[in-house]
Amino acid sequence: MNNSINHKFHHISRAEYQELLAVSRGDAVADYIIDNVSILDLINGGEISGPIVIKGRYIAGVGAEYADAPALQRIDARGATAVPGFIDAHLHIESSMMTPVTFETATLPRGLTTVICDPHEIVNVMGEAGFAWFARCAEQARQNQYLQVSSCVPALEGCDVNGASFTLEQMLAWRDHPQVTGLAEMMDYSGVISGQNALLDKLDAFRHLTLDGHCPGLGGKELNAYITAGIENCHESYQLEEGRRKLQLGMSLMIREGSAARNLNALAPLINEFNSPQCMLCTDDRNPWEIAHEGHIDALIRRLIEQHNVPLHVAYRVASWSTARHFGLNHLGLLAPGKQADIVLLSDARKVTVQQVLVKGEPIDAQTLQAEESARLAQSAPPYGNTIARQPVSASDFALQFTPGKRYRVIDVIHNELITHSHSSVYSENGFDRDDVSFIAVLERYGQRLAPACGLLGGFGLNEGALAATVSHDSHNIVVIGRSAEEMALAVNQVIQDGGGLCVVRNGQVQSHLPLPIAGLMSTDTAQLLAEQIDALKAAARECGPLPDEPFIQMAFLSLPVIPALKLTSQGLFDGEKFAFTTLEVTE
């Protein structure tokens, strides 16, 4: 854990220090003083009464001794509870289908003042140009948008076709950027454990920063070896004892509650007063509908308090201070002298009801963020352009031949989890011996002209129609699920025509579709409009059967080979436990 003061992120000049000290001593006028407020004490528990004094971007003082201090402006908190700004320890903003600018507009008023993001979705499509755009957005953001340098592009070498590479030389060019906090999730855990030099070179190059992990279900000697390599955290844990063992071995545990992977209920019982400095909250992948209707990190805090009886100071600790310490962001995470004034005022701390947000010492106005969004997005120079180099397809492209009496592998979906099971089904003249089997295909979209890779999917709940998307981790080829080849072709051709996006087909017609013009991943619409479009897509998808809560996000992970057990990439069926390709027909 990188819990030493990292001066790379603590940008304060000597002149600012002198001004801050003068206000702290009571010799100068503060910019803001927040009165009538109680401060939640994340270290000792309980509350601290008294004003919060702000000079510039920083807190100059806290407590009753500043009751009569002068200020240019006073903020009446009306009895609110003040907590540090919330921090998401690991996410891919692209998975929200919002640009970083729009994401800030949607989440900053909810108290999310800091994000640690890995832009490997757009980097897999566009390479370094995608990372550079995220860096430009981070530089101009009010929200603290920090970047982990994407480590595995593609997720697993030789297992899929993606749009670009991201070499170690290119990665090193970004290592010293002021918004970079470390190396993003090292997904090829098998390669790390076996000591592949190319992967160890990446770890060595970023060892002075934070090294993110990714090791779902890993245990035993393999987990020990992965941690020995220097990996510091994991956001992929989905079982209680798995999380406990990782904590015992010195890993920090990121408790994830995204739109598809929902691990909070399984892992929240681990959190206690002792280990909470090693526990963090993250969303990984969360869609705009859930952000609008349920919230972001604020929703996770609320559930910790209401459903798992986590004490207030511990719940807010894992949502801020623990993450700040882990990433060496020691100017964040506490409401204390010298810390950055990222403050969330709560009218109800148990319900996480946000009354007002300040970031870098300035109050945030949601309407101003919305009004400025279009201009700020244009200023960031988004990488527009069609990234779909694929010709339209026909139903014959999805034709599969099955032999009666033979057994075939089926990717079995677990609703609200990213892992799958590998099962099999026997084919007869009447079809398969289970009625929930549909077809799945992945089509590379980067001009390689490969035939679609086809397979079978169980447990998804699709009774009719087809769903297609260009959001399919991590290479973001076209993934389609359907009950008929004709409707699969129709759905795929719609997302090709849109230049990337999502589509629902039923009764031989397109029922709903959403173009995603930036890399086939992100929309330029407002968060509100995007949430409405997602709502329409989900409504259309529900007509196709009892699908997962977030069908498109769940579908997007069916092509990710670094999460077990059975996945489908543009190259074919992949066994995520053996880290090897396998066949559709079971012959062993």
Curated annotation (Swiss-Prot):
Q: Which GO terms describe its biological process?
A: adenine catabolic process
Q: Which cofactor does it need?
A: Mn(2+)
Q: Which UniProt keywords apply?
A: Hydrolase, Manganese
- EC numbers on record: 3.5.4.2
Q: Which CDD domains match?
A: AdeC
Swiss-Prot/TrEMBL catalytic activity = adenine + H2O + H(+) = hypoxanthine + NH4(+)
- Molecular functions (GO terms): adenine deaminase activity
* Enzyme class, spelled out: hydrolase
- Pfam families listed in its UniProt record: Adenine_deam_C (PF13382), Amidohydro_1 (PF01979)
Return the similarity comment.
Belongs to the metallo-dependent hydrolases superfamily. Adenine deaminase family.
Q: How does it assemble?
A: Homodimer.
Listed name of the protein: Adenine deaminase
Q: What is the lineage of its organism?
A: Bacteria, Pseudomonadati, Pseudomonadota, Gammaproteobacteria, Enterobacterales
